[in-house]
């Protein structure tokens, strides 16, 4: 196999161009086989095989810098830089990350995971290169979806002032060029991408600008005249008008054409956008037909394309989706907003039932929140469904546009807590901290599927901003015998004991049910509390616990700094200084990829680890807290 010849970075330079098509097919076969066993992002990676091969053919690693926006499409890049043998460990604890990681390879130039930042990072590299007098190429690869994020345009606007080379590859996998203008676009593209044309254009502009007083004006006038015609045919005029050179569009599966274009782009003295048309899922029919399903998928059967792991029960996202539709049927003023993730957040079902009340704003979390603020002021009830790790991109908008105005906006914070395989960039470990600091924000977390539905109904009737955080994965269906009404700022006591109180939040209620059972075996009859509300804090309950408890244990799947436990510590220190508080939370560090259960063991959040901590403290009391 040709693929077996790739052992380390730049080995691709030894492969004859005639063998590249076969190499592309071998890489596709390898990706399908490998991801079918481990799970991962498949459709996007199948779409960029030729694009990645073409880039590696014209670049040298690790000297040149290749920055992937989001980064989930970098599997072929990992293969070509000598990591093929590690793919059996993809997204597993201690194994290969599903995203570029600088700590994994010096060929990964930027740790990725979130959207629309690649051009900014690339521009930073370019300025650092020029300031230090170094000589290497910088390439940022960004998808058409990521271009819906405003940060990308901020960077493009800033890059327009550059006078040195910076290559931006627009990976367009939506095939947005209409057939009726495709012929003209390709014709004009062929003219504009010829070496003679680009060289002549740069030289002519430079020469004309030297004409005293009128040079720059002449160049601007010519640009305006030709743009009035070209804008009718070429989508790239958006970039040209911003001051960037535009090359393309080019077939993203024709490697020779792309190599010619990339080599031409390397000659441009300034920022250049190379527009590449690719097809998601190429080479595997199930992924090509259903790219959304194969965006991120678990292990699957190659023949059928269907997951090999069946759902045992509905996930929290499914429960939220059904509950939202039920509430929307009763509340005509309720609307739903997503930032380009209707499937991931469960809003696809809502969009089908209530299309006029559904808004997909693109990858633009900041806009989504301010947009929701306007909707709330206009008299409707917006529900903003966003992953925890992505919502943090809109902290200022939540604080300034929503909380400051005390607006009734509901935040459905999906993937809160540990998410597992996607690692540091996707763990939802910070939302309690950043949401709790906002004046007027109500923050809730359900213990099970029933409580999520009830909290959503409560949020719709509440005043001001409300956030409901819930985890990834199957919805906990235990403790159904406890179904007390949700009241503002009130916890739910599941068992009354003495001496030790365990206050569990959201997903940790399931874990702490085991903890309390284990403590009972050791003679420790602990009070077990389903916290429900992070904010407002249930101070009445804390006052009550202080009367007959020596130890209060808080358990949450959030970083300790700024978390629920610290809030309880602060209150108890001020009002009940004699009570010891043990906050159990995620330490002050980023959590890598791995299985959620395994990560909990590492972080001291497993039932056994929590029980051991409590037993250790209990045995240290001279008078004891055992019965």
Q: What does each model-identified segment do?
A:
Residues 86-96, 161-175, 196-199, 403-415:
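A glycine-rich helix N-cap at a beta->alpha junction
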Residues 218-286, 408-413, 432-481, 607-627:
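Structural signature of the thiamine diphosphate
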Residues 41-162, 316, 333-334, 338-339, ...:
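Cofactor-binding active-site loop characterized by glycine-rich and histidine/acidic residues
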């Amino acid at each position: 196999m040709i693929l077996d010849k790739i052992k380390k970075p730049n080995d691709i330079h030894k492969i004859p161009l005639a063998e590249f098509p076969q190499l592309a097919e071998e890489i596709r076969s390898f990706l399908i086989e490998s991801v079918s066993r481990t799970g991962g992002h498949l459709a996007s990676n199948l779409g960029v095989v030729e694009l990645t091969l073409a880039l590696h053919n014209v670049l040298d690693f690790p000297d040149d810098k290749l920055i992937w926006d989001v980064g989930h499409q970098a599997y072929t890049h990992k293969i070509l830089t000598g990591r093929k043998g590690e793919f059996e460990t993809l997204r597993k604890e201690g194994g290969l990350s599903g995203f570029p990681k600088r700590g994994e390879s010096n060929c990964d130039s930027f740790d990725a995971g979130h959207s629309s930042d690649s051009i900014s990072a690339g521009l930073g590299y370019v300025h650092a290169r020029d300031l230090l007098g170094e000589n290497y190429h910088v390439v940022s690869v960004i998808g058409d979806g990521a271009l819906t994020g405003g940060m990308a345009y901020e960077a493009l606007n800033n890059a327009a002032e550059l006078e040195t080379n910076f290559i931006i590859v627009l990976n367009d996998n939506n095939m947005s060029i209409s057939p009726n203008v495709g012929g003209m676009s390709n014709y004009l593209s062929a003219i504009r991408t010829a070496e003679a044309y680009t060289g002549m254009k740069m030289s002519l502009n430079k020469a004309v600008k030297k004409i005293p007083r009128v040079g720059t004006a002449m160049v601007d006038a010519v640009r305006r005249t030709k743009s009035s015609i070209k804008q009718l045919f070429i989508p790239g005029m958006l970039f040209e008008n911003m001051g960037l050179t535009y090359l393309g569009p080019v077939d993203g599966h024709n490697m020779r054409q792309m190599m010619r274009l990339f080599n031409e782009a390397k000659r441009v003295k300034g920022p250049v956008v190379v527009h590449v048309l690719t097809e998601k899922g190429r080479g595997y029919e199930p992924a090509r037909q259903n790219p959304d399903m194969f965006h991120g998928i678990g292990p699957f059967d190659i023949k059928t394309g269907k997951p090999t792991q069946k759902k045992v029960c509905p996930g929290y996202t499914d429960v939220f989706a059904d509950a939202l539709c039920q509430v929307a049927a009763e509340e005509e003023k309720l609307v739903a907003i997503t930032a380009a993730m209707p499937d991931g957040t469960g809003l696809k079902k809502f969009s089908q039932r209530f299309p006029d009340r559904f808004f997909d704003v693109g990858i633009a979390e900041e806009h989504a929140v301010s947009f929701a603020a306007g909707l709330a002021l206009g008299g409707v009830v917006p529900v903003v469904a966003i992953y925890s790790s992505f919502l943090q991109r809109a902290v200022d908008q939540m604080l300034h546009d929503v909380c400051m105005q005390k607006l009734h906006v509901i935040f459905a914070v999906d993937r809160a807590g540990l998410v597992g395989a996607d690692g540091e960039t996707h763990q939802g470990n910070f939302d309690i901290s950043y949401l709790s600091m906002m004046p007027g924000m109500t923050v809730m977390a359900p213990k099970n599927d029933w409580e999520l539905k009830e909290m959503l109904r409560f949020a719709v009737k509440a005043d001001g901003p409300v956030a409901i955080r819930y985890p990834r994965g199957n919805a906990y269906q235990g403790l159904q015998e406890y179904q007390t009404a949700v009241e503002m700022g009130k916890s739910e006591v599941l068992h009354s004991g003495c001496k030790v109180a365990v206050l569990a939040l959201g997903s940790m209620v399931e874990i702490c049910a085991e903890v309390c059972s284990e403590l009972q075996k050791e003679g420790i009859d602990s009070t077990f509390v389903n916290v429900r509300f992070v904010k407002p804090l249930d101070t009445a309950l804390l006052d009550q616990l202080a009367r007959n408890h020596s130890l209060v244990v808080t358990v949450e799947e959030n970083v300790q700094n700024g978390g629920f436990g610290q809030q309880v510590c602060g209150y108890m220190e001020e009002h009940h200084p004699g009570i010891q508080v043990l906050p159990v939370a995620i330490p002050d560090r980023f959590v890598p990829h791995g299985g959620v259960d395994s990560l909990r063991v590492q972080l001291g959040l497993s039932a056994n680890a929590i029980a051991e901590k409590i037993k250790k403290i209990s045995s240290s009391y001279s008078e004891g807290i055992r019965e």
